Amino acid sequence: WVAWISGEYVVRTGCYDSRSEAEDAAEDMDGGYAEKVSDTAVTVTVTGTTDILFEYDYQGILPLGVQPEGWGEEPITWFKGYRYRGAFEYPRITGGNLSVINVVDLEDYVKGVIPHEMSGQWPLAALEAQAVCARTYACRTTKHQSTYGFDVCNTTDCQVYNGVNASTARSDEAVDNTAGECVYYDGQLAETVYHSSDGGATEDAANVWGSDVPYLQGKQDPYESAASIPDYQYTVTYTREELTWVLQNSGYSIGDVTNVYVSEYTPLGNVYKVTFEDSSGHSLTVKGETCRMAFYSTTYGKNVRSMRFTISGGTGDATVGGATGGSTSTSSGGSYSVNGNQTLDSLDGASVISGSGQLGTLDGGSISIITSSGTQTVGLGSVSNVRNASGTFVITGTGNGHNVGMSQYGAKAMAEQGYDYEDILNFYYTDITIK
């Protein structure tokens, strides 16, 4: 078989278990010689066999590249059940595994991302917004994986990319319509993060990840609720024993958990701090995205899906603040009609029964009530949750994701209401430019 070694073609005749066997075979050939095994070589074989077709070795300096040829303008290569445009490189880091890299035009790459991050059947404007976000992310992230020989990975660690398998005429059209366009802030490529759904409000990046990003500012989302969102609301239940195990196995220094509650909300109503208490009286407070990630457990198959949730079964005071503002505590004024013909001057001290049947006492704060005209919220500040003697904590929330940047279901809802992709991007990202 033919081999391309260090810039020249050679012919190889066989593989041997030892150098002496190779040297004996070489003596039977005019000009033959034995070559040691290389840890940077790449061998091409017939699929499913050991029959060698070609070998390549450039000491790891240049990888093997394969450019497919075929009929039509866009030859397609199959790899592990997926179809890809463009060429492939097969670098091998010295002593390491072989990498498979798809070398593809930027627009073809975006066409391979869109239908895996958003349904290819969604409204065109939503797909166009997603295309601009995906393109911006790729351009901004290029070369951050360069030590491995590629620009971006193909998983959720970067953006899901699986070639052309899931592409639709509409998703491809969205990419073509926005070709070359990216999101900029102050002349620089923006970090166009996105999530599935915000549950009613996005959030400041500072309140989720700790660093303020001027164009990643939270806001109430009046559009998302109009979309039909699967599993928009979620409920997850933990026992004290489960929470203790989850926290301790995640490396947190805490004893047997006896209480957990939201200790601070952001002004937009998303969770900013959660406090855990143990049987020794010690407390642990986490903030930002850790508020939901602290509950994550593959062992129990449980997680908190968004930054927008409440906890029942614990007891504690919650303030409204966040990283971008000081805590505030206010109470509602006036009187409240109860039981038809009675009034209360204050809700402090009022007895209530929770949705789970637990009896408790209010000490003021943000309270949802059912009136003749619907559900309303009164007060804003100190909230005391009802203690659950059974030791079970119930987390109820809306949305799915980190709540920062564009809501994908919100983009869908805006598109369905007639907004274009620029409207969508300008709503979810503050003071940006699209060009």
Protein language model features and the residues they cover:
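Conserved, single-site charged/polar hotspot
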Residues: 1-435
